[in-house]
Design a protein with these regions (language model features):
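Terminal, low-structured helical/coil segments at or just beyond the last alpha-helical repeat
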Residues: 182-211
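Short coil/turn linking the two alpha-helices of tandem helical-hairpin repeats
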Residues: 51-54, 87, 119-126, 152, ...
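C-terminal soluble interaction/assembly domains
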Residues: 133-138, 143-164, 170-185
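Long, well-ordered mid-to-C-terminal structural blocks that present hydrophobic/aromatic surfaces
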Residues: 65-141
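Structural register within alpha-helical repeat arrays
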Residues: 42-50, 64, 81, 101, ...
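Generic helix N-cap/helix-start motif at coil->alpha-helix transitions
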Residues: 2-10, 18-22, 33-47, 57-61, ...
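Alpha-helical repeat scaffolds
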Residues: 1-2, 7-9, 20-31, 57-68, ...
Length: 211
């Protein structure tokens, strides 16, 4: 069939990039196998291929992911959907999908990884530093140090908006440095300390204190 011919071309390396792949993919989507297991396997293979060819921002990729979820709704497929939504800058929808994925698994490591993905969206994409900071402190396991690095960045990025005086605002960098040290990032800790109050700041602040 034409679908099988397209599949053969793709997996034999005839199709080299996203532009070559998508026209054949439209044929594939319209002629998916009727057998559910084969449908799932073939769709999964094409999702992997589109990732490899950097086609994840195409509407065809979203159609494939939605097709896979329809027939094989698992934690992995929901995460794939969330990653697609991140690419499309639909960040709140992505977080919703990741929370749905959390509800479908009891695997501790997978839960930690999903929590870290949510943290990254909150920090890198939405710039929600308060939310990201709170999430970061709750993350354990293999992602703990990376989460603490993000927590330190949240404190540093929010430093100028937290405190009633310049001295108080600069003091936030002490805490950012502490978090960075806990994360094992001594370089970042040193940079944060360089923004903390210096000897002159401390002297001037003491002079302002009530006698």
């Amino acid at each position: 069939s034409k679908t099988q011919e397209s599949i053969s071309n793709i997996f034999n390396g005839t199709i080299k990039n996203c532009e070559d792949l998508l026209p054949d993919l439209k044929v594939f989507i319209s002629e998916l196998p009727k057998d559910i297991d084969l449908k799932i396997k073939t769709t999964t293979n094409f999702i992997s291929l589109l990732k490899e060819k950097s086609c994840t921002d195409s509407k065809e990729y979203e159609m494939l992911v939605d097709t896979l979820i329809k027939f094989d709704k698992t934690t992995a497929t929901i995460i794939a959907k969330a990653e697609l939504l991140i690419v499309k800058k639909r960040y709140n929808e992505a977080i919703s999908s990741l929370n749905s994925a959390k509800a479908m698994t009891k695997d501790a490591v997978q839960l930690e990884d999903i929590d870290f993905q949510i943290l990254e969206v909150q920090f890198h994409n939405l710039n929600n530093y308060q939310t990201a900071y709170r999430l970061a402190l709750g993350i354990s396991g293999s992602n703990k140090n990376k989460a603490l690095q993000i927590a330190a960045k949240c404190v540093a990025n929010s430093a100028n908006s937290c405190g009633s005086s310049t001295f108080d605002r600069k003091c936030n960098y002490y805490y950012a440095a502490e978090l960075a040290e806990r994360a094992g990032d001594s370089g970042a800790a040193s940079r944060y300390r360089s923004n903390a109050p210096n000897a002159e700041d401390k002297f001037n602040n003491n002079n302002e204190l009530p006698i």
